[in-house]
């Protein structure tokens, strides 16, 4: 495949040279031009090198989205180092188990200072004026750095210890290019950084901005308020519903929304279209640096077709993908562990189908279970439950059963006031008997603290500890 990147320098340097006075970053205080952004990144990188940061090292970057966190990521990359953006809500016990395997050299903590408990040197974030530029000659040139490991993004997978997927700059730019070949995002447009940089979807926003040389907004204001001043955003359906309902009498600047994370009701996309907002849905993953397939949301369950530069195939029902945006591997104990591939095709472990001229994602292969001789795909049941207007998300967990082998249990989060008994009645006739959950539970807040995607394994562990199930097992002799 031909190289897509036209940059001879880092993207922010390129735009500082070609469009120095154009607005690059919208903040709570004042906008930054590309020239101002470049100067701030350069000063920060200088002070990082003065503290010992070198080419090839790794910096863990912990915190919520902020201007300082964004600049720290760019400055780290400018130094030729790898950046590991870290969710500040990950528990200390998990970090103690995970971080020693990721060969951390320095840490930056914009949250509560938890990283100070570990042994990593803390990088001070300083932007004092730099008078000499000779130090820049010691940094790796972009032509070299763009193919080297740049980011370690923890997989938001549903089970087990997160893996650190490694991407270089070219992979991120390839991913951005694929999305921007489909979505209209011009240099005068502004995309809200509405998703965290520790998640691949947040990185996707960042690299689309850098590739296009457009505007990025980082706001500390409430989401609904922040959305009223931008043209593009990445949201889940519940957030878009709230925006449309709370701004019925206002004119919105929002033009394009990339939706994910849940079933997308036709009523929502119709209402958005009436307000002048185009909605997009798709399919992506950490290992592919975000989006693989995308389409204009049309109320159908499919995810569309592969974006430019992406390939997708079905092998015995499994979705396999291939692209230049593919991760270099997983970083573990100082080594690059290979992805699970066949001739370059990444095995996603997702079940898929090609129906009515588009691809459909049916569910995870490892989620399938047998109940009374019937194959049960949890995502099929979850899709039905999620169609209820009060449901934000749901999980179907298999539990052992003496008669059926396994039975489904539903764990539900509501976006509006609703009772589990209401859902139980509403589901009657909408599911096959073997699909109907044997038990229903509300999703505990403690299970929602690890990022955008709730861990299915953690939900299962929690379910198995519930007194109702323990008593049921004792009565059945399991």
Predicted regions and their residues:
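AMP-binding/adenylate-forming catalytic core of the ANL superfamily
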Residues: 323, 351-435
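Gly/Ser/Thr-rich phosphate-binding loop
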Residues: 232-235, 243-300, 311
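Conserved AMP-binding/adenylation subdomain of ANL enzymes
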Residues: 173-190, 197-232, 237-238, 242, ...
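Conserved pre-ATP/AMP-binding loop-to-beta segment of ANL
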Residues: 5, 20, 133-154, 160-161, ...
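Conserved C-terminal "lid"/linker of ANL adenylate-forming enzymes
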Residues: 369, 395-401, 409-413, 423-478
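Conserved AMP-binding A3 loop
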Residues: 33-35, 142, 150-177
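Conserved AMP-binding/adenylate-forming
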Residues: 46-90, 375
